[in-house]
Amino acid sequence: MRSKHLVTLFIITFLSFSTVKVWGKDVFAGFVTKKLKTLLDCNFALYYNFKGNGPDAGSFLDFVDEPEQFYWFVEHFLSVKFRVPKHLKDKNIHNFTPCLNRSWVSEFLKEYEEPFVNPVMKFLDKEQRLFFTYNFGDVEPQGKYTYFPVKEFHKYCILPPLIKTNIKDGESGEFLKYQLNKEEYKVFLSSVGSQMTAIKNLYSTVEDEQRKQLLKVIIENESTNDISVQCPTYNIKLHYTKECANSNNILKCIDEFLRKTCEKKTESKHPSADLCEHLQFLFESLKNPYLDNFKKFMTNSDFTLIKPQSVWNVPIFDIYKPKNYLDSVQNLDTECFKKLNSKNLIFLSFHDDIPNNPYYNVELQEIVKLSTYTYSIFDKLYNFFFVFKKSGAPISPVSVKELSHNITDFSFKEDNSEIQCQNVRKSLDLEVDVETMKGIAAEKLCKIIEKFILTKDDASKPEKSDIHRGFRILCILISTHVEAYNIVRQLLNMESMISLTRYTSLYIHKFFKSVTLLKGNFLYKNNKAIRYSRACSKASLHVPSVLYRRNIYIPETFLSLYLGLSNLVSSNPSSPFFEYAIIEFLVTYYNKGSEKFVLYFISIISVLYINEYYYEQLSCFYPKEFELIKSRMIHPNIVDRILKGIDNLMKSTRYDKMRTMYLDFESSDIFSREKVFTALYNFDSFIKTNEQLKKKNLEEISEIPVQLETSNDGIGYRKQDVLYETDKPQTMDEASYEETVDEDAHHVNEKQHSAHFLDAIAEKDILEEKTKDQDLEIELYKYMGPLKEQSKSTSAASTSDELSGSEGPSTESTSTGNQGEDKTTDNTYKEMEELEEAEGTSNLKKGLEFYKSSLKLDQLDKEKPKKKKSKRKKKRDSSSDRILLEESKTFTSENEL
């Protein structure tokens, strides 16, 4: 017995010692050294030798001061399965055999649940520096740079220009070109007149006979050939995060960098320090007022030099992938990490201030979890479900004894009292067709994503998710709202039967699922926005699961706003067991450790709120319609009792773990009636605003760079330059900016390039809709269950003349079954033209405002309606009436369940 105790004591001591060893100052050293050091060295060797010309010292990545470079290395090397590129297989660089088909991040996360990223950064930085020292000796490592290309000070070249021609050299066959040196450029600048006059003046001063002969050939062929003077590009190189962390504006950051660099008397080692010499030379050649302005710039931080030459677009920067460095056409410097987008031009000027635009604000890499970069679906699921598995033992099914003990009132819920309409705000507009509502719902969600991704406050982000609390609630709530709107219009005979096969939630799912659908607006290639859009895509799928009994083509579920929920949990809202039925349904998903638990819970609560919302709106403001479908909705007082019962159950000891798990991922706003209804009212206001905006064209900022209007052609100093520097009221960039801020500004006649969320589908796509619908049904099988043949054939027959929403952010046109094909086509294109005139593109796309994230449902800004939408009512066709009547006879009504 003593020996067993001694063995136990020895094991505990050994384990404690091992833990101290691993979790010391270098928290990952113990584990990584033993198991992953080899794989890490393989990745470093592959990265530094990627070009195949031996290790490159310019490839060093600063993991600590430039977190974006750390995540880049994780994304492109550590998180993918290790493979040797073809161009390196025959080179004896490193022994890669032990590392093949292994992912460093995947293996690392299997040992560490979800470590803090900062210690990982520091550890990998230390390992990289050891690798760098081993290969390059005493060379000082420098992290990669962010490039800011600049060519001109107004229209003066910063560097000596290049004279390009289309005159062919008789010997080489290449076009003649002439690169000016500094002395020649000084003569060029002193010339007065046209560019050819300056070239002729230069010819008279050149002493080198060979260069002089080249200029002579150019001058002699000026009348028959194309001759131009082009400015070379100078790349301002910055360690972006490190040098811009204290500045809230990209352009001001570059200004501050130039001040610090140029005011140093000794020669700076920074690669962009020579820009000061180029500017000093240029300003001395041009003389006043430029030289005086440069001195003011050096001493006064309010004096700015770097200005935008074009209205900036997203993405702000082009970040390169490893394969881009192998492209001989791009010819990238190894030390270049990212470069200012080619559409986002900058130039130098002492005139005016930097325009007020959020795109000029500094973008810094946020700290994200390593699990974001896991390679395979298996890795992602492993890390996600691991969180759920730690929640404890599963909840056992409720017993009859417990039910009889906890339920004191076994009577059925009944309430026929009238609604107090003085406390109800009118919000619902029944005249908007469902097809329009679908597109507007997607657009509203895009605007919500804008607000969330632009927030700088991470306080509302749950610890175990990258999505802000409340976002999934808004996504599901809006989907449920418009889904129920479809049912209400069906019951009131205001909508075409064909809309039953085009559910809003599925439209939203398809809209946000594919990132390629979002090209042309702010969401495309925005990592944060992509995460939110995919989360909304997944969440919206659970709405039809609750509203339509998980099988989306069962006609009986369209007969009320709660029948699908009743069938889902096998109980009726009036039953005293209804709350327990909902909780027990959710317990099954909680015990599985499934994300579906959270999404089903939000969807079920949303459906209950939606019943209350439509009951109040129809009862108070649409009394005739209300009498027709009164029995198809749950009375608000009953809804309140159900919601209160669910909330109390979730707070009980038995189900408290479920509530805790939910709050780890989502907001408690779902339990607040006031906040939920505020979100619904805000969406209704947005619908009215959007309908009004659809009637006019909104001017869109062109992506074409703005050309500066100045009489200065880059030749010499003249009086007009002084006027340009001192008297010009505003730059073209500011003029464009102010014009876009004024929403009532006059419209321009040129073709606009607005990126609409409601784009019409091309005619060629119409023929493919049937196939796409079938593909979608197969894809959604695991969520919705099998399809009924009768309803499937009905929906297939009724969709032959309809525009589908299966691809892209489009709205669908509906046409009655008794219209001819020509008339249907005319109506289709008429609606397409109306949609093309719609406004409502993202304000972030225009770069006019800086949105703060709305972290709670009641904090979302309300959209102000501007005009009333013209009333239009669609009648259901007679054939659809017969179909619905026949199908309704084959199913029991909701009152019999």
UniProtKB/Swiss-Prot annotation:
Residues with PTM Phosphoserine: S804
Signal peptide from the UniProt entry: 1-24
Keyword NADP: no
Residue stretches of biased makeup (Basic and acidic residues): 820-832, 877-889
Topology relative to the membrane: Single-pass membrane protein; Peripheral membrane protein
Compartments, record wording: Host cell membrane; Parasitophorous vacuole membrane; Cytoplasmic vesicle, Secretory vesicle, Rhoptry
A Pfam match: RhopH3_C
Cystine residue pairs: C157-C231, C244-C253, C262-C276, C421-C620, C475-C536
Annotated region described as Disordered, given as residue ranges: 788-845, 859-897
Biased composition (Basic residues): 865-876
Principal location class: host cell
Entry comment on modification after translation: Proteolytically cleaved near C-terminus.
Reported consequences of knocking out the gene: Knockouts are not viable, suggesting an essential role in asexual blood stages. Conditional knockdown results in co-depletion of CLAG3.2 in schizonts. Mislocalization of RhopH2 in schizonts. Decreased number of ring-infected cells due to the defects in merozoite invasion capacity. No significant effects on merozoite numbers, maturation and egress. Co-depletion of CLAG3.2 and RhopH2 in trophozoites. Resistance of infected erythrocytes to sorbitol lysis, indicating defects in the formation of new permeability pathways. No significant effects on the activities of parasitophorous vacuole.
Keyword Ion transport among UniProt keywords: no
Composition bias type Low complexity, residue spans: 802-817
Membrane-traversing stretches: 597-615
Keywords: Cytoplasmic vesicle, Disulfide bond, Host cell membrane, Host membrane, Membrane, Phosphoprotein, Signal, Transmembrane, Transmembrane helix, Transport
GO cellular component assignments: cytoplasmic vesicle; host cell plasma membrane; membrane; rhoptry; symbiont-containing vacuole membrane
Ranges of Polar residues composition bias in the record: 792-801
Function: Participates in the formation of new permeability pathways in Plasmodium-infected erythrocytes enabling the uptake of nutrients from the blood plasma. Required for maintaining invasion capacity of merozoites. Required for the trophozoite to schizont developmental transition of the intracellular parasite.
Quaternary assembly: Component of the RhopH complex, composed of CLAG3.1/CLAG3.2, RhopH2 and RhopH3 with a 1:1:1 subunit stoichiometry. Interacts with CLAG3.1/CLAG3.2. Interacts with CDPK1; the interaction promotes RhopH3 phosphorylation in merozoites.
Protein name, UniProt field: High molecular weight rhoptry protein 3
Organism: Plasmodium falciparum
